[in-house]
């Protein structure tokens, strides 16, 4: 994927492709995918402009999470959903939120990602969206 225009100008790395389940409004239509990616503004510490708003370190050299939408499996046609700012930023620590991985099965959708914490650690965290909730959201 090409680098982004703003917060992800230094790096864009797709970490996961989640095919949208064929449920609800997506049951009969063309299918698509959500691509999760890690982006970074810079891969080194940036000196901030003293007249600009100070930002946490995570906005300069740690990866934050973004998303794209792609029709079918045509990853080359993917369009950014997080054009001017990341979609996934931890409310804790440096804001780091990266390395998304998903699994969709009959039980629903499982997602894991690395998330910055107040104590500076960055553990893997997980969420499960049950199948009935996936169907409700896509209907």
What is each residue range found by the language model?
Residues 1-23, 27-94, 104-139:
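Beta-rich carbohydrate-recognition and catalytic domains
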Residues 97-100:
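Short glycine-rich, acidic/polar surface loops and turns
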